[in-house]
Amino acid sequence: MLTIDKWGRKPLLLIGLTGVVISMSICTYGFKQATYQVQQTAINEIQQDAPSVAIKLTPLTNDIYYSDVEFKRTLKTTLTSDEYDAYQQPLLTSSINMNAPLVLFGIIAFVASFAMSLGPVMWAMLAEIFPNQTRALAISLVGMVNSLTSFLVQVVFPWELANLGAAATFAIYGVFALVSLILVAKFFPETKGRTLEEITEEFERSA
C-alpha cells in the first residue's frame, strides 16, 4: 500500500501477476520432476501395524513412478479401499523424491506476489473503475464473486490433486494467471492521479 500511489495500480498488478505466473511455473516444474518409489523403511514401519499391507507393498519397491497420479492409482489397485485411505498419505510423503526447496520457493514467491499486488491493489482499483451511480452495487457483486471463487477453489483443489496431479494443478493456476496478466496489460487503465470522471470517460471511449 505504501507504493500504490507512487508506482501506480497497473504496474503493481503487472508485476504481481508476472510473479504469480513465474511462481506457478516453478511449482509445476518442481512437481513434474518428482519421482515416487515405495521405500523399504516405510514398509518396515507398516509391518508393525499391518503385516498384510506390508506384504502387498513390497513388490512396489522395485518400481519408480513419474507422476503422483500414477503412483496413487497403483496404490489403489494394490490395497483395499480402507487400507488406501489409511496409508496413502504417509506412503506418498515417504515415497516422493523432489526438489522441495524449489517448490517451497515457488509457494513463498506466490504469496509475496499476491500480497504486493492482487491482494490490496484489486480493492483499491474497484473503488475507482466503476461509475458513481453503480459503484456500491458493483463492488458488492465483485466481492461476492471473489468470495464464491475462493470457496470453489478450496473445494476443487483436493479433487485436482487427486485426479490431475500436483504438476497439472499448478499449471492450470499458472495459465489463469497468464490470461489475467494479458487482460490487465491490454484492457485495464492506470487510475493513479486521475479523477473518477476521467476514468469513466476512458472506459466509455473504449466501449
Regions found by a protein language model. Name each.
Residues 1-207:
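Alpha-helical transmembrane bundle of multi-pass membrane proteins
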